[in-house]
Amino acid sequence: MKKILVIGGGMAGSIVANGLARKLNKEMNNGLIEITVISATDQHLYQPGLLYLAFGRVRENELYRDQKDILDKRIKFHVDPAVNIDANNKKVTTESGKVYESDYLVIATGSRIMPQSIPGLSEEAYQFYTPDGAREMRDALKDFKGGKVVINVNAPHKCPVAPIEITLMLHDYLKENDLLEKSEITYTYPVGRVHAMEPVANWAAPEFEKLGIKAETLFNTKEVDGKTKTIISEEGTKLKYDFLVTIPPHKGAQVVEDSIEGAKGGWCPTDKKKLYLEGKTDVFICGDTTNIPISKAGSTAHFEADTIIDNISSLVQEGTMARDYDGKVFCFIETGKETGSYVWFNYTTPPNPGLPTKAVHRFKLAYNKMYWLSAKGLL
């Protein structure tokens, strides 16, 4: 029997496990393949929905499903966080002390926010990357009466267009609640334009200007002074705020940083086409966990998962890998309360954001409902 072990029960891990169960359906039914998923939690969270939770536009319980209900019934599922990954031998030790062995290992441990890496940021800034953070931001917005709003972007971070989305949605929120005239919005970004991807920056900059949103580029956050309500950059720029929102810096999982050689910042050194751990053709990396210099997004995880599913199933059935990952990424961009845009790109095609429309916004809302089919690997 061949054993496939998936570390991580998020979008990437769920799609890989479910996709392999379908591709290797006959082998599973005949007892030739065993698929196991280990996770730190028994709940599956739709992370993009946290952006809507921060504005009170979705109920929190709509963002969760039981992880066991997401997975194919034949997949073994254990809530037992990994504490050590032995990539050389494809073994994983968990918090309970159990050691899981495998023939093929998939590492899909995701990323974590690190606001604590910048003095004062955790204490002063709101963020929407965790349920607690989104809830706190929602509640604080209800009490906000206007003033200086600063959206502070740090790198690296997941969801490439999240900084643009939160800024435009905040603008519409203030307008809808008659607070725009009493407020001033400033957006900070660490490089010399409003987004790392130049075509996105070229699209967003005039949108900001049209809406009266100030942009402070080359702003690498040094610290936040809660006493004076000031955020300070390494370059020496100081901005006053009454309401501070941050896109916090991210790192990969601690277990990856501790276990995998060369995994600086918790990002695994990954072959950009075959998606295996460099030097290990039977250990695959999916989603935020890779160190590939492309956007960390749900769609990235999905497209990578499709490649890994094809390659592992082909290795099992034919002894060879099936195809390459082309770097494809697709992201919706919420441009306000009622309009949306999108952007897609890959290793050879640069992004080119479309014009915001109500139709794209509605499609995004529809996808929010259909996400669970994606996690099950049905979309």
Question: What residue ranges belong to the model's regions?
Answer:
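FAD-site-proximal beta/loop scaffold in flavoenzymes
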Residues: L121-K145, K238-D306, D310-S314
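Active-site-proximal substrate-binding core of FAD-dependent oxidoreductases
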Residues: S313-N352
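Internal hydrophobic alpha-helix adjacent to the cofactor/substrate pocket in enzyme cavities
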Residues: D172-K175, A301-G327
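C-terminal auxiliary extensions adjacent to catalytic cores
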Residues: T339-L379
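Beta1-alpha1 glycine-rich phosphate/pyrophosphate-binding loop at the start
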Residues: M1-K76, P156-E198
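Glycine-rich, N-terminal phosphate-binding loop of Rossmann-like dinucleotide-binding domains
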Residues: G9, S96, T109-G110, E235, ...
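A Rossmann-like FAD-binding core segment of flavoenzymes
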Residues: L32-T36, I75-N88, V92, K175-T270
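FAD-binding core/adjacent interface of flavoenzyme oxidoreductases
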Residues: M1-K3, I75-E165, D172-E176, V245
